[in-house]
UniProtKB/Swiss-Prot annotation:
It is a multi-pass membrane protein. Residues 15-25 have a biased composition (Polar residues). The chain crosses the membrane at residues 49-69, 382-402, 412-432, 450-470, 481-501, 515-535, 603-623, 639-659, 665-685. Its cofactor is Zn(2+). This is Vacuolar membrane protease. It is an enzyme of class 3 (hydrolase). It comes from Candida tropicalis (strain ATCC MYA-3404 / T1) (Yeast). GO terms for molecular function: metal ion binding; metalloexopeptidase activity. It comes from the Eukaryota.
Length: 908
């Protein structure tokens, strides 16, 4: 049968000139494909409708998957076995009892919690000969930070579950049982303590573990990590090598693996049943983006290896009265308790002491309760391989495509995407900083994702207008592949910086949370290589003259099976091309158009869904972890608004190669979404009952001080208090650094209020030697456990337990020492400026001595000392009034160690 004969079906024949001058017949009408083929073509052909459908499905998939993965209710199952149900019920009851009252170190309720825990521990370990209990008190004097010395009297509760193999180093479980004065401490750290009791009960009722497990129920973590520091000096501490610290820097939700000391210990977190983790938070903590610390810091600095497991949100009720039982889900407790049991069970019964990776920082994440981790070295090796392979593979392919396959990349191709990124970034900066931020500055505290989604819509519209506008003015070929290659290059540059940072990873310059760039680059680069390979293996087209011409141009990307809707039809570049010339290339062109009309779907599925999920989930976790800190400082506010812009830009990046194919309905939807978002941003209140304004309080020397961000309306809130209106007292607001203010007013004191007292007197003053002076004071602050002293030029301090005597300064060793009378010394010739004092006795007097060196030009060789003592649980009418009368969208936290303080000044 000749080429001009009909094979099957009815087909219209068209003669076509061949290079040899002969004529062949080409069919222009073929048999209609079946419905399945037509459906596949309609779905996966490069049509605007198909692309828009894919984009919408990707957005739905991304948000739904992330929401599910981060959901407490969907991912954490309550226990089903009888024993675990009993453990959870018992721990929940413990939590209710622990959090009955605020129980800071300086409160009487703290003693009640101590006694309750002492009773529960004794009851749990009764009749267990392999378990020991140490509930003795301890005293320490140490250098807690630069020029600061702290004295602490502690009453930690220590339990040792002895293992069957004494040669194995011990494993520590730690949590603190104190709260802040303004909070019931359910999450911080009642759930940690309740979980410790649950794990202790689990060990006491099961087979004796192979490895010794030690529990530290420690006190006074909130204002100096004192309980953990005191335990470091305990004899049991010497046998410990591993630890798990349980903490709460939020108020409920899921307990996340904040950070780990090294890969060798972090990798074992895959043994827990509900892992929830990301090293993004580890990077944030290590780079000081979170302005709080946990006992993890003490244990790591003491040489232990371990994990920090904690609740992290929401910070606007963290340290407030809203951190209470009624705001907590029992699943949160079970999440922490079950993971603690699993991790303890594995560590205590496994030989992990020869593990590799103990000197390697860890990179980790969890997905749907699956845990993945690797070391910095391993990821760096992968990154370097990818960095080298990308130019090695893509360079030759790009050269072949351009040189031999005649891929014409014009100026519009090269510069349209970079130009669009620059312009859109500027638009985003103006919209966010000069628009949203000025209209509703503190909105990120309650609706951060409204800002993100609205910004994303505006930026996506901007990209659509710019890219289509450039393409209209200067039509370009295969812009999709060009864009994919350019985005791959952007990720390649970013990966180089990430790899460099990881190679020098350190505290303060941590990069362990930037693993997402490896994933994003791998996906984008693979798609770009796929596109280049497709170009490389195409056949050349012969013109009637026999000369070669390019097989493909940008206009061949359209779907060509006749099912295009009106939005999918694109004008051809050369409208005056003759009908005969069209038919000359129809068969070859049709093959290429079908090939390149479907490759987009593979590229889209390879790049967009996973990239979108990685970017969205990472951005959501960062925003969810830091958005409340906008109430803490201007620096935090600047960072949050920067993250909103970066989040929006990066979320759009994966779909940029396809953005000009969005159909008009998607564009209209984006416009509507942006308009609704802008309207809401302009009208909604930044604070509400679920996302309250957080203010901090202290009454100092009879004057109430309220601290918060400038611009949140503190003076208006205070001006509505009955005592302020009735007394006519003025409210004075002073600006503080970093965007904060201190608003103060004379506190209301009814006749029956308990007024604390503070007295400081000099009890000994001598000139020890010609160049050094000595003096001592006595501080009497009934019902106060905590005081702070500020001074200058002090070289050594003494905490007296007995007779006050002046020891020869040269005889005092540097650092900490203790004499035969039980007096504690700390000497630092570089200077001590602050002393923090913490005592257990309620009416015990502080006796302190000081060695100082006066300046040569001082007229008087006296040492000025400023003393401030704090009270936590006395009646505070001004604070009670604020709790009672402020709106339900305001919460209150402590500013200092107590809610009331008195100051005194003395010269020795």
């Amino acid at each position: 049968m000749t080429s001009g004969e009909e094979e099957e079906g009815t087909r219209e024949q068209v003669p076509v000139s061949q290079p040899t001058g002969t004529t062949s017949i080409v069919s222009t009408k073929e048999k209609q494909p079946n419905i399945f083929i037509r459906a596949i073509r309609a779905t996966f052909g490069y049509r605007k409708t198909s692309l828009t459908l894919f984009v919408l499905l990707t957005i739905f998939f991304t948000v739904a998957f992330s929401s599910y993965d981060n959901s407490l209710d969907f991912t954490i199952d309550l226990p089903e076995t009888k024993f675990e149900k009993q453990l959870l019920d018992s721990s929940w009851l413990d939590l209710q009892n622990i959090a009955r009252y605020p129980h800071s170190y300086g409160s009487h309720a703290n003693d009640k919690v101590h006694d309750y825990l002492e009773s529960r521990i004794s009851q749990t370990i009764k009749g267990k000969p392999f378990i020991e209990f140490d509930n003795g008190d301890e005293k320490i004097l140490y250098n807690s930070s630069k020029k600061v010395v702290s004295y602490y009297e502690g009453n930690n509760l220590l339990v040792r579950v002895n293992g069957t193999d004494s040669s194995l180093p011990a494993f520590l479980l730690s949590a603190h049982y104190d709260s802040v004065p303004s909070s019931y401490g359910v999450t911080d750290d009642g759930m940690g303590i309740a979980s410790l009791l649950g794990v202790l009960s689990y060990l006491a009722n099961n087979k004796q573990p192979k490895r010794t497990v030690i529990f530290n129920f420690n006190n006074d973590e909130e204002f100096g990590l004192y309980g953990a520091q005191a335990f470091v000096t305990h004899p049991w501490f010497k046998q410990i090598q591993y630890f798990l610290n349980l903490e709460g820097t939020g108020a409920g939700g899921k307990a996340i693996l904040f950070r780990g000391t090294d890969y060798g210990i972090v990798k074992h977190f895959d043994k827990v049943r509900y892992p929830y983790a990301t090293s993004i938070f580890q990077q944030g903590f290590n780079n000081r983006l979170i302005h709080s610390e946990t006992d993890y810091k003490v244990y790591k600095e003491a040489g232990l290896r371990g994990l920090d497991l904690a609740f992290y949100k929401p910070r606007d009720i963290y340290h407030t009265g809203e951190d209470n039982i009624k705001n907590i889900n029992i699943r949160s407790l079970w999440h922490m308790l079950s993971n603690s049991i699993d991790f303890t069970n594995f560590i205590s019964n496994s030989i992990i002491d020869n593990d590799t990776g103990k000197d390697e920082p860890a990179i980790y994440l969890s997905v749907l309760n699956y845990f993945f981790s690797t070391s910095v070295t391993t990821l760096n090796t992968i990154n370097m391989v990818l960095i080298v392979l990308f130019p090695v593979l893509s360079g030759p392919l790009l050269f072949i495509t351009v040189r031999y396959k005649k891929w014409n990349i014009g100026t519009a191709n090269l510069f349209s995407l970079p130009l669009a990124i620059v312009i859109t970034s500027l638009v985003g900066a103006v919209v966010v900083n000069q628009g949203f931020r000025l209209v509703n500055e503190f909105l990120p505290a309650s609706r951060p994702m409204l800002l993100v989604t609205t910004t994303t819509s505006i930026l996506l519209l901007t990209y659509y207008i710019l890219l289509n506008g450039i393409n209209f003015v200067s039509p370009s070929g295969d812009q999709k592949l060009v864009s994919i290659i350019q985005i791959s290059f952007i990720y390649w540059i970013a990966l180089i910086f990430v790899t460099r940072g990881l190679s020098q990873n350190a505290i303060g310059d941590d990069h362990t949370g930037e693993f997402a760039f490896t994933i994003l680059f791998l996906l984008e680069a693979t798609a770009s290589l796929f596109g280049l390979i497709g170009w490389t293996f195409t056949r050349s087209v012969k013109e009637p003259t026999g000369d070669e011409e390019p097989l493909l141009n940008g206009r061949m990307e359209r779907y060509v099976d006749g099912s295009d809707d009106e939005d999918d039809v694109e004008e051809e570049d050369d409208e005056d091309q003759s009908e005969e010339e069209n038919h000359q290339h129809e068969m070859t062109v049709k093959h290429l158009m079908q090939h390149f009309g479907y490759d987009w779907s593979l590229q889209f599925l390879l790049i967009v869904p996973i990239s979108s999920l990685v970017i969205y989930n990472s951005g959501w976790l960062v925003i969810d972890g830091i958005n409340k800190s906008i109430q803490e400082s201007l620096v935090a506010e600047n960072f949050i608004y920067l993250i909103i812009q970066l989040f929006s830009q990066f979320w759009i990046l994966p779909i940029l190669p396809f953005v000009y194919k969005l159909n008009r309905f998607m564009v209209l939807g984006l416009i509507a979404f942006a308009l609704v978002g802008v309207t809401l941003i302009s009208s909604v209140d930044p604070f509400n009952q679920d996302n309250p304004l957080k203010l901090r309080f202290i009454e100092r020397d009879g004057v109430a001080h309220v601290y918060g961000r400038t611009g949140v309306g503190i003076s208006n809130i205070l001006g509505d208090m009955p005592s302020v209106k009735e007394s006519g007292v003025g409210i004075k607001c002073d600006s503080l650094p970093d965007g904060n203010e201190d608003c103060s007013y004379k506190a209301y004191l009814p006749g029956n209020s308990t007024i604390p007292s503070l007295s400081v007197k000099s009890i000994n003053s001598t000139a020890q030697q010609a160049y050094i002076n000595f003096g001592a004071i006595q501080i009497n602050a009934p019902e106060s456990r905590e005081c702070s002293l500020e001074f200058k030029k002090v070289k050594a301090i003494v905490v007296y337990s007995g007779e006050i005597t002046a020891k020869n300064f040269k005889a005092i060793p540097d650092g900490f020492s203790e004499d035969s009378k039980g007096n504690l010394y700390y000497k630092d010739v570089s200077g001590i400026d602050v002393a923090q004092l913490n005592k257990l006795g309620w009416n015990k007097k502080f006796n302190f001595g000081f060695y100082w060196l006066p300046d040569i030009d001082d007229d008087v060789a006296a040492l000025p000392i400023h003393v401030e003592c704090f009270w936590s649980d006395i009646t505070i009418p001004a604070y009670d009034e604020l709790l009672h009368y402020t709106p339900n969208w305001v919460t209150w936290a402590n500013r200092e160690k107590g809610l009331v303080s008195l100051t005194n000044r003395i010269e020795v």
